[in-house]
Amino acid sequence: MQWEQTVYWYALSISIIRQNAAFVKGFFAGKCGYFYAMGFRRNKIAYFLRTFLQCSLHHAAMPLQTAKNRTSAVPAAYDKPAEGGMHMPLISLCMIVRNEEAVLGRCLDSVADLVDEIILVDTGSTDNTKAVAAEYAAKIYDFPWCDDFSAARNYAVSQAVGDYWLWLDADDVIEGENHEKLRKILEAPEADMVFLPYWLSFDAAGTPQMISRRERIFRRSRGYRFTGAVHEAVVPSGSIRYGDAAVSHRKLHAGDPDRNLHIYQKLLLSGKRFSPREQYYYARELCDHGAYRAALPVLEQFLQEGRGWTPDNIGACLLAGRCYARLEQPDAAMQSLFRSFCYGIPQPEICCEIGGLFLEQQQYPQAAFWYHLAIETGHQPHEGFWRQECCDYLPAIQLCVCYDRMGDISTAAAYNALAGSFRRGDAAVAYNRQYFAEKAARRK
């Protein structure tokens, strides 16, 4: 009889909670309600109700079953318990948007079934961005744009209630096998911070070419926040995991190319002292705008102060080398590139730049050495940004040129074939193939 009464009260409690979902959400979604339930976790009834509340809040935060034809009426995170009987963590997606009507649906289609709530902060859209977001039951907030990406992102993060949060841009998308890879990571992040590959550009065949690794998923209780008005980032701390689920950046239209530089210049005029990362990215913006002489002292100050992250230090040496090369100072360019070895092993892109300088000077054996090294180091783990073609296609096609100039036609043809294996249907490879065929015919 006592057991029947207990079951009755369980059922009655559930019924009351279901009928008062708004109150439950408002109370228990807040910090006070959460810690109230946690404080009575050892009480079986309270613990049972807390577990049920998490399920209920999951439904309230992410009613996507009807929005985009979810086949199951039960959210994916609660289809089954994780190992040990504990439920999978709740995931909040945090985004900032402005006039992203054309791409937002594509992004959310690729990730909506992996998250439990969508936080969307709009910084001043004048198109139908909000209407698109509403189709996915996103929680939409307005945030006046103040030339500070971190401020907007941190506002979005502050609205999240999940155990973990992740960020995406509206023109990002989770494609192909990466969707399932991300699902597995989100089911059990097993770290405070998870880094994921970021595919920033692609060749004609769709192969990623510009790649970086970005901090992407965070344990909310750690209080992580972005820093930097432009090229914002979260400083790594706590336990870190490196996942293999890549995020693809598929921009449809180029944005304002001067926006970031203008923000940096505005900050300088206000008297702001740049952090090391801001120094580095300010120099990058100057380089992108062809202001090579202006970029060089910024890069030198960044390296001299010695407070930058290792990938940024290597990147600064690469940028300085390119600036000197554009200014027709090859010796200074070479010194800057060799300086990068103070911060780590030779990177493929650095090796290709050095090889290119030797090739311009018609020092073919030296150039070939560095292109060989680019291929050999291309299989090493990379940090920061890297160009995939510098690991395979570019050094191979340049080795073809080097060996041809040195008179080793068979080796040159072999490296041309290797380049073709990395980039199918490449025009340069086809031209070289015809060139070697004609050369062989003349020898006969």
Stretches with model-predicted labels:
Residues S110, D122-A131, W145, D169:
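A conserved acidic beta->alpha catalytic loop
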Residues L90-S92:
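Cell-envelope/extracellular polymer assembly enzymes that use nucleotide-activated donors
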Residues D116-G124, Y141:
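Short beta-strand/loop segment that forms part of the nucleotide-sugar
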Residues G105, D127-Y136, E177:
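Acidic helix N-cap motif at the loop->helix transition within catalytic regions
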Residues A131-Y155, Q159:
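Conserved donor nucleotide-binding strand/loop of the catalytic core
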Residues M95-L114:
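Short, well-formed alpha-helical segments that are part of the catalytic scaffolds
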Residues W165:
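Short aromatic/hydrophobic "clamp" motif used to bind/position activated sugar donors
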Residues A151-V157, I174-Q301:
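Catalytic-site signature of metal-activated, phosphate-bearing donor transferases
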